Amino acid sequence: MWVPLLNAFNQPVYLSIADALARDIASGLLSPGERLPTLRELAQALQVTPGTINRAYAEAQRRGLLQGEVGRGTYVRSTPAEPVPTPMAAPAAAPTQTAGQVLDLSIIKPSGDTAATWLRGALVELANGTDFAQALDYAPDGGHPQHREAGAQWLRHSLPEANGQQVVITAGAQHGLMVAISALTESNDLILCESLCYPGIISLAHSLQRRLRGVEMDEEGIIPESLRELCQRERPAMLVCVATCQNPTTATMSHRRREEIAAIAEAFDFLILDDDIYGFLASDPIVRPLASYAPERSVYLTSLSKSVLPALRIGYLYSPPRLLSRLTAMVRSSVWMPSPLTAQLASNIVNEGLDQQLVRLQREEAARRQALARELLPGLRIKAQPHSYHLWLELPEPWSADEFTTLARAQGVKVLSGSQFQAERNGETRGVRVVLMSPTREEELRFALTQLASLAGASDPRRFY
């Protein structure tokens, strides 16, 4: 039975196994068509989990070294494989577009291809783990202690002081927003947010019967003077804020700006809901989350959906102790409990360090796509961060955002009009949000951005009708 000699200790074990496979195939130690050990056999020989071996085999298949056949096992590939694409595959030919096909650049999500191979092994490990039976049962309020501790481990990359006792598990970040707003404010309370904000906040405020006001913004997000003036006129109960890579504008608050916002919250006695869903994309990791500037009046929210995979519907609320019981009660009354099975999968990903490896890959992929956008959108006013998944395109006159969005779709590209992000419909916006991470292939993204550049550069929109 083949057992690899592992030389590298500065990388994940599964990568060392994949490297050993490549080395032994190249040297002739492993022959074309040779059958490899089963997951369990090699896991026992190396004293690792079957999930680790599954990830190693999947990585080797991605490199074109192996092939698998259902019921027969895994074999050394008999014929050379096609070159393995990068997460965003480079174009082999000029872009083509099928009639009626629309490229969707409207949904913010991570690169699915980057995570899929890695997560197959995590799913195998979940099924074989000692906590599998517990993950099939009901969970206590707030979540199982080990799941809350894994949440705290994820949070410590931004909040070093995080502990599992102050973590509440939710069914994703959107559920976390609903839980926090429902539990900590009352009907007809005033909720503040950015003047251009995540549409999910707008729909929540409407369905929960909260009043919503948008605060004026600049390049760093909410303007302190505008926030203070609004607080002098009305009494807000909560500020919902995205301080890093804000959706849709990508605005990111400086250290000084966060201090000012926290001081205003203290002065006017309102809560802060710090939605840090994109915090892992920060270009300056030294800047702390907004919640850490006013920890006793802040609830911090994040999830793994944007860094790992949208289907991983697990979010984490981090709260001061005095608010925990209200948050856990609202989780119970809304969904009874987030899925313990999904929470266990998320915990395994965090505990094995897979989350940080995926964060690194997603950041690298986002940076590549931002560079491509700068190349293909010359002369246009765009707002973006070096690692943000999206950009904000400010349209020249005489465009309106709604008109541009309609015509872009007719040209085969779907983006979102700035009107969908307006907390209050009190004027026209000329901005549109363009998501760069959705297309799988570089030629698709190139086509979409080229179409948008051509459209935005037109002096007379009427010629597209």
Which residues are covered by each model-predicted region?
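N-terminal basic, amphipathic alpha-helical segments
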Residues: 1-127, 136, 332-339, 364, ...
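Conserved core of the PLP fold type I
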Residues: 134-268, 280-299, 457-464
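Conserved core segment of the aminotransferase class I/II
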Residues: 299-363, 460-461
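Conserved PLP cofactor-binding pocket of PLP-dependent enzymes
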Residues: 409-433, 463-465
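Short hydrophobic/aromatic beta-strand micro-patches
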Residues: 318, 392-394, 435-437
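Conserved glycine-rich beta-strand-loop-beta hairpin in the small C-terminal domain of fold type I
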Residues: 363-374, 382-395, 404
